[in-house]
Design a protein with these regions (language model features):
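Pocket-lining segment of extracytoplasmic ligand-binding domains
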Residues: 120-223
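Extracytoplasmic small-molecule ligand-binding "clamshell" domains
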Residues: 4-74, 231
Length: 350
């Protein structure tokens, strides 16, 4: 059995990112993880978010490094175990760096977040839990729907491109990922002002939104406890990542899941098991189509029956008239014969 386990490679998936320090410490963490497996075969696969979601629906890896929004959904619906959260260097609490800071141009007259509803807002194309989804969480917590508040969203490939669009007046505001404002060059920062900046005890950076765990390591329920402990021991005691942060005890993902549920996030739709209500809702159009066809057939049937009755009545009426004419003819013929006979008798008597 252990030989079979050794021959079967341990699958490690990681979410690929293009911005921020996670593009360095997540692949390095995956290297450390497979290094702890000894002579066990392994396979590391890297996917961007759409690919990862698609693959996870059909293939459950042993370990996965991902943003905590996907982590919360995997924990909830695929029963993955949340092993560790990544505590960023600028964070003072386990994994609590996933927030967003909304910035506006220095000369903008926008006073608060509510005024941004429906305006043109920039976001990073790559940002998930940090940045975009925390901003969505903030708007939905205030009673807005995602569709109404973020009606005119524009995606940018990097912060610089987005900030330049903001300064040029192409967009009204920009959603920055947690701590990205502090990393901007001073020249750029001087042309901006944070909207509703808040200071949280968990981080040394400003934020507009609540903070959530950022990166998570999760293990499949089929991974043996012994292997989980080996991986935990390796990553928690590793100092090689200290430039970026460290892996710590898992921060709860309940609030992340609640945010996704509240804002009707598409991840919920991707992984939530279907209920009878969902199936009925999905079937509403085909069912309506079938009912309309049946109703059409019923109406057609009624019209055909009505037409048949009408035609039958016309035929009956025609026959009745024909019989009446025939009867008249018979009477006339009878009268004619009697008249002729009478004439003949009278003629004979003469």
């Amino acid at each position: 059995s252990s030989q079979v386990q050794k021959d079967h490679p341990v699958e490690v998936f990681l979410e690929r990112t293009k911005g921020g320090n996670s593009q360095f410490y997540i692949p390095e963490s995956a290297n450390l993880l497979v290094g702890s497996l000894g002579d066990q075969n392994w396979e590391v696969l890297s996917y961007d978010r759409p690919e990862l979601v698609s693959v996870l629906r059909h293939n459950a890896p042993d370990f996965i490094f991902t943003n905590s929004d996907l982590g919360a959904v995997l924990q909830r619906y695929l029963h993955y175990k949340h092993l560790l959260s990544f505590k960023n260097r600028v964070s003072t609490d386990a994994g609590k760096l996933s927030g967003s800071l909304i910035v506006i141009s220095k000369n903008s007259n926008i006073q608060n977040l509510d005024e941004l509803a429906g305006k043109k807002i920039g976001r990073l194309a790559t940002s998930s839990m940090a940045g975009w989804k925390t901003a969505v969480g903030e708007a939905t917590a205030r009673g807005f729907t995602t569709q109404d508040f973020f009606r005119r969203i524009q995606s940018f490939s990097d912060n610089e491109e987005m900030i330049n669009a903001l300064i040029n007046g192409d967009i009204s505001a920009a959603i920055l990922q947690g701590c990205h404002y502090e990393r901007l060059p001073v020249g750029l920062r001087e042309q901006l002002k944070p909207l509703e900046p808040r200071e949280f005890t968990e981080t040394r950076c400003l934020s507009t939104s609540e903070l959530y765990p950022a990166w998570s390591l999760l293990a499949s329920p089929k991974v043996p406890e012994q292997m989980q402990m080996k991986v935990l021991g390796t990553l928690k005691n590793e100092r090689a990542l200290s430039e970026f942060g460290e892996w710590t005890a898992p921060a709860p993902l309940r609030d992340v899941y609640a945010l996704l549920k509240r804002s009707g996030d598409e991840l919920i739709d991707e992984f939530e098991p279907e209920t009878w209500t969902d199936l009925l809702w999905k079937m509403r159009y085909p069912t309506l189509f079938v009912l309309l066809i049946l109703f059409g057939l019923f109406i057609h049937d009624r019209l055909v029956v009505k037409e048949v009755v009408k035609q039958t009545a016309l035929v009956k009426e025609g026959l009745r008239k024909q019989w009446a004419i025939e009867k008249k003819m018979e009477t006339w013929e009878h009268a004619s014969i009697v008249s002729i006979m009478s004439s003949m008798v009278a003629h004979e008597l003469k």
